[in-house]
Amino acid sequence: MGSYIVVRRLATQPKLAHAPKRKWKSVVGLEVHAQITSASKLFSGSGTAFGAPLNTSVTYFDASIPGTLPVLNRKCVESGIKTALALGCRVNEVSMFDRKHYFYADLPNGYQITQQRAALANDGLMTFPVITPGKKVYYKSVNLLQLQLEQDSGKSLHDEQLKRSLVDLNRAGVPLMELVFAPDLETGEEAASLVKELVLILRRLQTCSCKMEEGALRVDANISIHEEGAPLGVRTEVKNIGSVRSISQAISYEINRQLELVAEGGVVTNETRSWDAEHRRTVAMRDKEVLQDYRFMPEPNLPPLHVNLKPGSVSTQELISVAALSKEIPELPEHTRQRLVEHYKLNAETAIILVNEPVLLEHFLSITESLADVPTKVVTNFLINDLLTYCNKLNLDIEDYTTSDNALKDVLKALHAEQINLQAARQLIQLLHTNPTSSVSELIGQHNLQQISELSTIEAYCQQAIANQSKAVQQYQKGKSKALFAIAGEVAKLSAQKANMKIVVECLERLLKK
Amino acid sequence: MLRISARFYCKIATQSSFKAAEYKNKIKKDKKLNFTQLLHPTKVPQTPVPAAFSDPSENVVEIDTKTIQLLERLSLVDLDSDQALATLKSSIQFADKIAHIDTQNVRPLYTVLEKQQLQLRNDQVTAGDSRAELLRCAKVTDEDYYVSPPGNIPLEQ
């Protein structure tokens, strides 16, 4: 078997080498299902709490008992409209509900109530920064084709050994908004950046918790490749992507899989694949190998949903006013970035990093407010280069680094007053993490982190360093100014990283000039 | 064109001044269905609407044997007896009326309730925990789960 593969590879490779170099383009479109934050379900009065005991948040309607009827949850409509407005959509005056039929054990009705012919909103646009490690940040715009309200299905657990599925209907009927984006993306990083921005927006609007680990935000990606100038290729759909990081990995994997498949003379088939996070690959799924006919039909139990589009109108019990809801929309992430650039004179990339980590932004705003004399550059450098880097190194979510603003303020205060140096500040980030109850001044005292600024002590260190680094001293005196760093480094080492480097450099320059 | 009059719809259930007790008495007197069991107001007409259609009863329905066989296969209903055949023919004749209605220049409706506004419910938990009752309806359950045949799972598992 192994030798067969080798032979085949050898046989195809020369052909590839002779083939004219063709440019392949990848096309990615996303469908995002976001659970609308609500107390009760979309069409029934049962709760939506995550992790409720099995099958306890289920009304007769959710279990599809004959004679029950859907009644639409007002808050879900309002949240859908708010989200639509934030994403620049046209909200439709009349939208309708449809039944989408498919047969599955966790869908007791045999159909899902969704919006197909006339959705709540259409034609939005999302513009977001794309962050690719090691590349320049750029902005990308993607059209939002449709935003629709729909029900979630129940949850199936697959029991491999006993060849059966276990069904929990707690999730059946939970409100979702499905956002269908146009295939305007090209890479996994762009897709991940879109989702990241969407999460920021939905969290600001408080219309979705965006907890991917709870299934509150689910992303399906449609991926195809085609030659430049040729029509779009056959697409595959990747489901089951469980984190923002996986989005970029899953899509990059799938693009490469298709490119390799085509390079080997294969053909991409229209199929649903699942992302296997453990082995970092996409896997074909058994179902949906043939195109399904969902037999869409109007939902006869729900008259059309009307909203009031008149400017200046107010909401009534019967009719929701879009104009009234538009006033409730908070500042959106992109606006915050612009404000940071204009008001605090931050550069664009710093603003993007701060806004993308809401905790950092909170720290930044609170620190700059109370420590007005510390330059913003020092604050952002500390938060991004030191705090965020520390968390990334530990693979720790910045939101889980629990410390008070005050502790961070104290560190920055000490740093700014030259009581401690940057090395000590970095050490304090770690100490505050491991000793969350200690105060900064206590930690500085306990761990002897005070910066050494006394001239006499520093001069002694410098004399020692000059003696130790005679080679560097010679180079420096020959005019190689960079050699000073080696001597300064020696001072840092001798002083256990505690010397005030500004004074050290001044002192060294003075001593060596003599 | 579209002619929907307000009187087609259940006035009682949509009125906010609706008083259940008063209505109950009225039902007792009128011997009508008890609509007080509806939890939410409805937009569905609660009384039948009489409509006049032209009666195409002279169009006698004829069905060939092939069609009858097809219908039997599709419906799993035995149409061998004369009575069954007569019922089928009269059903078709009854439904045939609809084909003779003049629909020129009439925009198709998705629903007869198209001009109605959908009723909205406040976001409150009002029901839910009926697990014991609902699980009792299922044939196979295990530790509060419904049990079903295996569903779609990755091919390589």
Swiss-Prot record, chain B:
Catalytic activity: L-glutamyl-tRNA(Gln) + L-glutamine + ATP + H2O = L-glutaminyl-tRNA(Gln) + L-glutamate + ADP + phosphate + H(+)
Cellular component, GO annotation: glutamyl-tRNA(Gln) amidotransferase complex; mitochondrion
GO molecular function annotation: ATP binding; glutaminyl-tRNA synthase (glutamine-hydrolyzing) activity
Keyword field: ATP-binding, Ligase, Mitochondrion, Nucleotide-binding, Protein biosynthesis
InterPro entries, A to Z: Asp/Glu-ADT_sf_sub_c, GatC
Subcellular location: Mitochondrion
Transmembrane segments: none
Pfam families in the cross-refs: GatC (PF02686)
Keyword Signal: no
GO biological process terms, semicolon-separated: glutaminyl-tRNAGln biosynthesis via transamidation; mitochondrial translation; regulation of translational fidelity
Highest taxon above the source species: Eukaryota
Keyword flag Ligase: yes
Note from the entry: This protein may be expected to contain an N-terminal transit peptide but none has been predicted.
Subunit-level organization: Subunit of the heterotrimeric GatCAB amidotransferase (AdT) complex, composed of A, B and C subunits.
HAMAP family registered for this protein in UniProt: GatC (MF_00122)
Known function: Allows the formation of correctly charged Gln-tRNA(Gln) through the transamidation of misacylated Glu-tRNA(Gln) in the mitochondria. The reaction takes place in the presence of glutamine and ATP through an activated gamma-phospho-Glu-tRNA(Gln).
Protein name: Glutamyl-tRNA(Gln) amidotransferase subunit C, mitochondrial
Organism: Drosophila virilis
Record lineage: Eukaryota, Metazoa, Ecdysozoa, Arthropoda, Hexapoda
